[in-house]
UniProtKB/Swiss-Prot annotation:
Keywords: Cytoplasm, DNA-binding, Transcription, Transcription regulation. The keyword Transcription applies. Its main location: cytoplasm. Induction: Up-regulated on galacturonic acid. Involved in control of pectin and galacturonic acid metabolism. Probably represses a comprehensive set of pectin fermentation genes by binding a conserved palindrome at or downstream of their transcription start site to block transcription. In the presence of galacturonic acid may activate transcription of acetate synthesis and other aspects of carbon metabolism. This is HTH-type transcriptional regulator Cphy_2742.
Length: 333
């Protein structure tokens, strides 16, 4: 039995049940007693939701991150821990890798630690096969699940994400209006976020009536050596491009190195735009124009939503944050 069963049998919202459990005064005595009677009848014992009652709460949040060496994910974990600490919560961090079975294992581990909620950082936690996401939905029946940069429909899963589609659409459109017609797109993932970015690229070309060339959409591992090797093979194939947009800053850094080594000028011959606005953008020459997905804002919003959920408030299940293009030296905007 869980909080949803109590809600259904008592004929009240999940938020109302949560308020009763948390001792929130904004519930009538009649409703409160009805909820308590149902809880007793079905044998439901509050655990992590019972913050106000002090029942089994650990004041601890689980954080799941697929790869702590990824600059975006590492930065997100930092801001999450900072904001949780400000709100009086500790955190357990699990670096899960990308395999489904390890993600399932670590989620089960966090639930066994009786954490108050779980934050999943990055859309790599969403699988293409929807059945493989069932373990996340099952966990959401026990604790609130916060998902950063991905979307999964469930009443107890709360998603905070950037508008990746619009961000890439705007960046590509800006290049096109500057006269760039052969825009190479490099990406390293087919995650929810990765597919949103790719769809933004395609939509921008369509909106400006440019042909969609499959050769100009290349998947590439997120490291310098593989980026260089891929670009070198494209040159040998005779592929021409006058701009490059990448799904990650590191792919753009590899592109900068390759273009410079080939004797072409940036941005005169080739304009380059990265994604994430990471520290890497100012550690290269020329400095990289990049899309800022506001990771700190994402994390602050996520924790703010989480605190409201734990306090029994009604909150939206999806919050979208807009991105900004930070112009530096790899474009001539």
């Amino acid at each position: 039995m869980n909080i949803y069963d109590v809600s259904q049998k008592a004929g009240v919202s999940i938020a109302t049940v949560s308020r009763v459990i948390n001792g929130n005064p904004n519930v009538s005595e009649k409703t409160k007693q009805k909820v308590l009677d149902v809880m007793k009848e079905i044998g439901y014992t509050p655990n992590v939701f019972a913050r106000g009652l002090g029942l089994n709460t650990m004041k601890t949040i689980g954080i799941m991150c697929s790869d702590s060496s990824d600059t975006f994910l590492a930065n997100a974990v930092y801001h999450l821990e900072q904001n949780l600490r400000k709100n009086g919560y500790d955190s357990f961090l699990c670096c899960t890798g990308y395999e489904l079975h390890t993600k399932q294992k670590y989620l089960k581990l966090l639930l066994s630690k009786r954490v108050d909620a779980i934050v999943m950082v990055g859309s790599s936690f969403l699988e293409a096969n929807k059945k493989d996401n069932a373990y996340i939905m099952e966990a959401a029946d026990e604790v609130p699940i916060m998902l950063i940069n991905g979307y999964l429909s469930h009443p107890r899963i709360y998603c905070t994400l950037c508008d990746d589609h619009q961000a890439v659409y705007d960046a590509v459109s800006k290049l096109i209006t500057q006269g760039r017609k052969e825009i190479l797109y490099l990406y390293n993932s087919k995650s929810y976020s990765g597919l949103q970015k790719l769809s933004g690229y395609k939509a921008a070309l369509a909106a400006h009536e440019l042909p969609l060339d499959e050769n100009l959409m290349q998947m590439c591992p997120n490291n310098l050596a593989d980026t260089k090797n891929l670009l070198n093979s494209l040159v040998k194939q005779g592929l021409n491009y006058d701009a490059v947009v990448t799904a990650e800053d590191l792919l753009a850094i590899g592109t900068i190195k390759f273009i410079k080594d080939s004797g072409r000028q940036i941005p005169q011959d080739v304009s380059i735009i990265g994604y994430n606005n990471s520290l890497l953008t100012t550690c290269c020459d020329p400095e990289l124009t990049s899309i800022d997905n506001h990771v700190e804002t994402l994390c602050i919003s996520t924790i703010s939503t989480l605190m409201r959920v734990l306090n029994g408030n009604d909150v939206p299940n999806k919050t979208t944050i807009s991105n900004d293009l930070i112009v530096r030296k790899t474009t001539n905007f």
